């Protein structure tokens, strides 16, 4: 083992000799990961962690509310799964293997989105969550009443546009 002596110190710090030899081997492996796939991809096939980019002619949404009922879906019909509860990496891998998108459910109190700073922060959090979980976008599911021409009305319009722009910029092919 090589030793490093710090100037003005009598302490010796052992340095492993094999580490420099591993770095050139690891770099090509990291570079070989498909776009959108990272080393922490939960799928057996890392390519399944890439965002789905195809655009179907029509959409068939499934709103997943948990458990493992997704194992019994007719995957030949489904284009998008919206997760209403806890993230399930097994579901994400399976859906991507079947060519279906998996998206977040986006819900936020309408009174809060009037504040542009809050709105931007909420959108950034959703994008980060979607990217961390290898998801393909977001389904805004806001079911609160909004009066026509109210501040909430215009804020909701801004939320939809800003969310769409952010997701499309950050996740290729996202919804």
UniProtKB/Swiss-Prot annotation:
* EC number in record: 3.2.1.-
Indicate what this protein is called per its UniProt record: Di-N-acetylchitobiase
Name the family. Answer: Belongs to the glycosyl hydrolase 18 family.
Q: What positions does the domain GH18 occupy?
A: 39-175
| Residues carrying covalently attached carbohydrate according to the record | 115
Predominant location:
other
This protein's superkingdom?
A: Eukaryota
**What functional role does this protein have?**
Involved in the degradation of asparagine-linked glycoproteins. Hydrolyze of N-acetyl-beta-D-glucosamine (1-4)N-acetylglucosamine chitobiose core from the reducing end of the bond, it requires prior cleavage by glycosylasparaginase.
């Amino acid at each position: 083992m090589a030793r490093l002596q710090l100037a003005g110190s009598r302490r010796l710090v052992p340095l492993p000799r094999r580490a420099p030899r591993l770095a050139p081997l690891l770099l090509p492996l990291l570079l070989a990961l498909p776009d959108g796939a990272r080393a922490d991809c939960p799928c057996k096939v890392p390519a399944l962690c890439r965002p789905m980019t195809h655009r179907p002619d029509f959409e068939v949404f499934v709103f997943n509310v948990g458990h493992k009922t997704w194992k019994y879906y007719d995957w030949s019909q489904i284009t998008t799964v919206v997760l209403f509860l806890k993230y399930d990496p097994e579901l994400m891998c399976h859906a991507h293997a079947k060519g279906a998108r998996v998206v977040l459910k986006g819900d936020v109190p309408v009174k809060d989105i009037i504040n542009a700073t809050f709105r931007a922060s909420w959108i950034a959090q959703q994008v980060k969550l979607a990217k961390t979980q290898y998801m393909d976008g977001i389904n805004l599911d806001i079911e609160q009443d909004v009066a026509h021409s109210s501040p909430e009305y215009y804020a909701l319009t801004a939320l939809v546009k800003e969310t769409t722009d952010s997701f499309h910029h950050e996740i290729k092919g996202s919804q």
